[in-house]
Amino acid sequence: MDGIVVVDKPADFTSFDVCAKLRGIFETKRIGHAGTLDPMATGVLPVFIGKATKACDILPNGKKAYTASFKLGIKTDTEDIWGEVLKRQESFVSQNEFVAAAKGFLGDIKQIPPMYSAIKINGQKLYSLARKGIEVERPEREAHIYQLDILNFDEKNQSGDIYVICSKGTYIRTLISDIASKLNTIGTMTALRRDASGGFSLSEAFKIDELQRLKEKGELQNALISTDKAFECFESITLDEKRTWLYKNGVMLRADQIGAKDDTYRVYGFNSEFLGLLQTDVKENKTKRIKNFY
């Protein structure tokens, strides 16, 4: 089997755990995922099966959507409720104050990654250093917040929920901590659910036990999404029979042979088979293969 299955990752599972489960269900070792989710987080985890694993590192849609819960007046070493509590303090923030502060983070922002993250500094993952009690300086990283909605805010308990659409690499727990800092208080994330990632959403996601039941009924193929759906943001080109043969035999086509402008394209054979991604250079009359999927 080849394709993409969108998994609704359960809490207490690492992304690797999910892949391990699916290797058993799909009976293949060729499985990978895109967009790691923290163990306590739930939601959309795109998993790639068979030939589709070639797409893991080239997904074009970097936007992600999250629903997160938070509580003000508490600070942990991980910036989420599952870490060690470092500080507690009284917090007196109104809903209007929180909304105003949060809206100030729309657009381009900079974040200092948390120590408990998979980012590498001098070849070492930050969380490995953090577990040894070592804290190192982390350079700021750019991120973009496309949408930030306050779903609710409980002034009495100083807690609430937000919905965020953001760029790849955005840390929601850091965003919550930074909003709290802007309000001269502290805050931590108490829950996280990914609603969308890489163009895939919860509406097309399967729980692991649902996939197991589909396998038992011989309907596992119904859970798979074709690999080319991940690249629908690109225009498509369909080759005739001769050029399909040339393409599949490694011949580099000229840009004028396929009538393309400067862009990245999904390439299909004459029989509608998804062949891969192609980049064109009209000025040089060249094409460059990004990835083959046949």
Labelled PLM ranges:
Residues 87-90, 125, 169-173, 241-255:
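A short, terminal or domain-edge coil/loop segment
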Residues 1-167, 174-206:
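Catalytic cores of RNA-modifying enzymes
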Residues 136-137, 169, 283-288:
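A short local loop/turn or secondary-structure capping micro-motif enriched for an aromatic residue
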Residues 1-12, 16-33, 37, 41-44, ...:
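Accessory RNA 3′-end/elbow-binding domains used by RNA modification enzymes
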